[in-house]
């Protein structure tokens, strides 16, 4: 066993504007198995991928968290609808197309391995980190659409990663900040959260192990560090034979444990993602090998799983798409075409209609007009003949409230703050007819004492989805989706 063999177990982060390229070059010399890219311009990402791969003696896997397309992280690339928007449509064709576009643009950037799809279930409105990243709360819908997305990725030469095993949906803690505890019974996990992982076990290129304490599986270690979870359940019971990668080891759920990387490998992980100090982790792995905690055969098996992924990529690696594949007309058209099928009215409420000549007050809680995020929505209403003004309470004017709430790593919160909820309810109470348009989390529509006349969910704030929401309200388009989760207390 060589030091480079141990290094191949490590996949450090490469954060543009922060990571020292010389340090990255030293990591390549050490023999790491790949990098996870964050940020950057298109030119920067492609050049970093090219130069790192050229330095490496073994094939590098370049990964990125492009859940909603590369445009989520890379300026100049296409951002695509959230999983929950696709879930609302129920369309495998849209899921597959999202995967295909993501793969083409990722490969144009030199990224081979997309850390998607999320198959966590949207089973808790207060979950601060899953929410619209999930397809919905139904495991069957999730497995079906995630499978279609994976087929789209693979068809265009990129690898996927099903995450976050054994399911992060039923928690209320962001694992970037602390260790979530999942209190479901084993029967509950098998009936719900584990279903997508079981259904996709043969199809998934890789599975990401989540940093969450699933008490029904292991009361002493989070799933990412648990042999009972990774080997006993995922490998032996679910018959998954592909590569297991940890979630980022610099997340606070496990970062305080200096032995987390070694524990994860001993539990059954094949690649150790984004450690705080990759060189220190390499030294820890070497010590664990020297004292017999890690065996050469286990390392060889993990490396062989990496090599299997590299072989899967080999037909595509010699001919990456050109950079002009980014934001090409066909990819941009996808969002406009998909939007009407993804938008969904709140059930149990009448569909609200605006007409040319109507005066409508627009409102975003605690946000002055100069900072509105819904400018495309407002602009389209005006274009279609509505007179839109900043909402004035107590005038009896019709109200359109735009809510932009989405999961953000390290924020620890989601949906509306108490202050936002108070000002929103006051606006609804003082309005004539009112509609809340959720350009993100649909759960903002639940739990309000003063409820709107209607609710429309777009599940994301992409420009084409804002335009579609305005057209739906003007009866120029039909909202064809169904909210794929239960919105409580309507």
Where do the PLM segments sit?
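Preference for extracellular/luminal or secreted protein segments
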Residues: 1-31, 236, 257-490
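Active-site mouth loops of central-metabolism enzymes
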Residues: 7-19, 83-97, 178-192, 250-255
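Second-shell loop/turn segments in exported
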Residues: 16-17, 37-39, 83-93, 131-139, ...
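Second-shell residues forming the walls of enzyme active-site clefts
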Residues: 26, 35, 40-64, 70-74, ...
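Surface-exposed, active-site-proximal loop segments in enzymatic domains
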Residues: 75-88, 124-135, 174-180
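A substrate-binding/cap region within the structured catalytic cores of diverse enzymes
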Residues: 90-111, 118-134, 139, 146, ...
